[in-house]
Amino acid sequence: MPQTLPSAVPTPAEIAEALSRRILGQEEAVREISVALSKQLAGLRVGNILMIGSSGTGKTTLMRAVEGYLASDPVLVARSAVVRIHANVLGEEAERGRPGEVVLGRLLERAREQLGPSAPVDMLLRRAASGLVFVDEVDKIRSHVGGQSNVAGIRAQEALLTLIENEAVPLTLPAWAGGASVVVNSSDLLFVCAGAFEGLYDSVFDRVTIGRDRGALQPVTVVEGGKVAEKLVFHLRDWLRNEDLFDYGMSPQFLSRFDAVVLLQDLGQDELVRIFLETPESAFHQSRGYFESRGIHLAISPNAVRRIATEAGRQPRLGARALKEVFRRVIRDYEFDPTRSITGGALLIDLPEVEAVLGKA
């Protein structure tokens, strides 16, 4: 008979709505994560996800948003332990001959934090075995770098494979849990692996323009500035194939364990503006908190925000991180002397103040 979902399990749409308050402009990634998380919370088997996106496009922010979402609901906290780990750590553990122990150990500790120190060890192990594992910078465990074999990367991929597909992973329990050696079925873990995959964009572009698929990408006619011209329009999502990831250094066995490969989009000006104004972690909101602590209300005009976003957009490989660097240049003198240009207890940053630092667009 079909399995009936517990009534408390949120739908993918409900999860996506909550995550979208923290992560902007990455609808596909949010949808994939939301579906996978809803299934896992219901106790269903779910496929793993590989996220590819330039620095600053929101990979880590999305991971943190999921953690925050689960932590905000006591019912959900009791159903899923979540850990984040750097991919290279898996390689280091594999070299010590205990692949997977660090991940399962952290999940066990996380489950204990959530369920309390008096929770039975068997219950904690069950929670850990159905946890959510975010693996950051997974592109750093490629099998080769600069034409040279990367032994640590190979071992890390093998260690991650062991966790993803193995139903019998050995784990030595910590002292507080008795210190015994147990075997954990890790096949119910949900893995979300993410990386920037620097150089992948260029290698795929070369493949379809000057490489083995030369001519596959054809120029299109566009009108720019009132002039008709031919232009190559390239989007990685349209041309990325598994063999491109193989060539990058991710093994076929490793990639076959991911049901979805999600490409995060580089952020446009509209997304950068929203991130700057709407996300609580933005440089603007952090600076506003600083000024409020001194009794000053910080405001910024729409034109000034647009100019900052335009400048940040010139560094597409940095994504939203470029906003922090650009805004820092604008605001640092005001933060040094908070009383500068104050009118009626407020500081307004307008376009002239921004252009005085950045120049005209």
Regions found by a protein language model. Name each.
Residues I52, T61-P74, G91, E109-D122, ...:
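Canonical AAA+ ATPase core
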Residues P12-S20, I141-R142, G289-R314:
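Short conserved motifs of the RecA-like P-loop NTPase core
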Residues T61-R64, V192, S203, I210-L217, ...:
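C-terminal engagement/docking regions of AAA+ P-loop ATPases
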Residues M1-V9:
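Interdomain "pre-motor" coupling segment immediately N-terminal to P-loop NTPase/helicase cores
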Residues R84-E92:
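A short hydrophobic beta-strand->loop->alpha-helix junction that borders the nucleotide-binding pocket
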Residues V83, V133-D136, V262:
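Hydrophobic positions in the central parallel beta-sheet of the AAA+
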Residues L41-I85:
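Walker A/P-loop
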Residues V9-N48:
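Pre-Walker A (pre-P-loop) alpha-helix and adjacent loop at the N terminus of AAA/AAA+ ATPase modules
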